[in-house]
């Protein structure tokens, strides 16, 4: 498994992916992605490896019906915090969930639920860049927003998007994720709900 992750990380790097994009593709932390790209498949020093869990949800992501079912469960979690005007997906992997959740939430409430997209700083090549909400989707100012991502690894991206939303005059009401590897229950007063929480023993 580890050699396969190293191979995938090196392949993604050769295709021009940033460390943040590699981390997202492999569902690992940026530190782990950086470590993987520096390894060779023949000499792996396990002592130096960051403590992390690789998450593979290909069987879910490859099926639109499975994505719809899981998104409905995530929408159900979000609705306990009230009606949202906008569902914001964190690029790249949070966007399909957010799209399907907005549809489900609109059907449940009878109100139109818009879609917004956030591009986190970890996807930017410029060191001084900031994360940004795409101008091609819904505006968030004055709106009640549910934030959606696939995996929380460190919590930095979630904290970043909550800060950006508040700075733009939005009211984030909840964060929903498929998998939480960090055990985060709230970010800056915004509750975090996960379908699956991974805990390390020992």
UniProtKB/Swiss-Prot annotation:
<dbReference type="GO" id="GO:0019856">
    <property type="term" value="P:pyrimidine nucleobase biosynthetic process"/>
</dbReference>
<dbReference type="GO" id="GO:0004588">
    <property type="term" value="F:orotate phosphoribosyltransferase activity"/>
</dbReference>
<keyword id="KW-0804">Transcription</keyword>
<dbReference type="GO" id="GO:0010468">
    <property type="term" value="P:regulation of gene expression"/>
</dbReference>
<dbReference type="GO" id="GO:0003677">
    <property type="term" value="F:DNA binding"/>
</dbReference>
<keyword id="KW-0238">DNA-binding</keyword>
<dbReference type="InterPro" id="IPR000836">
    <property type="entry name" value="PRibTrfase_dom"/>
</dbReference>
<dbReference type="InterPro" id="IPR029057">
    <property type="entry name" value="PRTase-like"/>
</dbReference>
<comment type="similarity">
    <text>Belongs to the purine/pyrimidine phosphoribosyltransferase family. GfcR subfamily.</text>
</comment>
<keyword id="KW-0805">Transcription regulation</keyword>
<dbReference type="GO" id="GO:0006222">
    <property type="term" value="P:UMP biosynthetic process"/>
</dbReference>
<dbReference type="InterPro" id="IPR022854">
    <property type="entry name" value="GfcR-like"/>
</dbReference>
<protein>
    <recommendedName>
        <fullName>Transcriptional regulator GfcR</fullName>
    </recommendedName>
</protein>
<dbReference type="Pfam" id="PF00156">
    <property type="entry name" value="Pribosyltran"/>
</dbReference>
């Amino acid at each position: 498994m580890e050699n396969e992750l190293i191979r995938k990380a090196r392949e993604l790097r050769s295709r021009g992916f940033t460390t943040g994009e590699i981390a997202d593709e492999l569902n690992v932390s940026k530190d782990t992605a950086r470590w993987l790209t520096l390894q060779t498949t023949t000499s792996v020093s396990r002592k130096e490896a960051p403590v992390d869990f690789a998450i593979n949800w290909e069987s879910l992501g490859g099926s639109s019906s499975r994505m719809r079912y899981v998104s409905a469960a995530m929408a159900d979690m979000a609705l306990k915090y009230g009606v949202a005007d906008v569902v914001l997906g964190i690029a790249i992997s949070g966007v399909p969930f957010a799209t399907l959740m907005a549809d489900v939430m609109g059907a449940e409430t009878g109100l139109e639920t818009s879609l917004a997209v956030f591009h986190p700083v970890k996807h930017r090549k410029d060191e001084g860049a900031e994360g940004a909400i795409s101008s091609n989707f819904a505006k968030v100012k004055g709106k009640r927003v549910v934030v959606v991502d696939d995996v929380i690894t460190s919590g930095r991206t979630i904290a970043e998007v909550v800060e950006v939303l508040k700075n733009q005059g939005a009211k984030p009401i909840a964060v929903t994720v498929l998998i939480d590897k960090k055990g985060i229950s709230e970010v800056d007063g915004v509750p975090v709900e996960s379908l699956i929480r991974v805990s390390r023993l020992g």
